[in-house]
A protein has these predicted regions:
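Catalytic phosphate/metal-binding cores of nucleic-acid and nucleotide-processing enzymes, i.e., regions
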Residues: 1-82
Length: 82
């Protein structure tokens, strides 16, 4: 996620072996802002566990986004910088 670096952040590939369904990327931005980002190809779908994880993060008031296309990435970067 080169675009994250351009806005001063770091994107980590996130793997949690004992917790299937977690987001693909953990994006850390300045001022303590953290995003969980699930990257899907167009036409892909979220698994049941990914949906559960996303709902859990929303319930915990965490930043989470699912990106399906370059346009989604552009929109997310814009949201991250607002």
């Amino acid at each position: 996620m080169r675009r994250v670096k351009e806005i001063g952040g770091v994107a980590y590939k996130f793997v949690s072996p004992s917790n299937r369904g977690v987001a693909d990327r953990l994006v850390v931005l300045p001022q303590g802002v953290v995003w969980f980002v699930e990257v899907k190809k167009e036409g892909g779908r979220l698994s049941t566990l990914q949906n559960i994880f996303a709902a859990e993060m929303v319930k915990l008031q965490q930043n989470i986004s699912i990106v399906w296309s370059k346009e989604d990435v552009d929109d997310l970067i814009k949201e991250m910088t607002e």
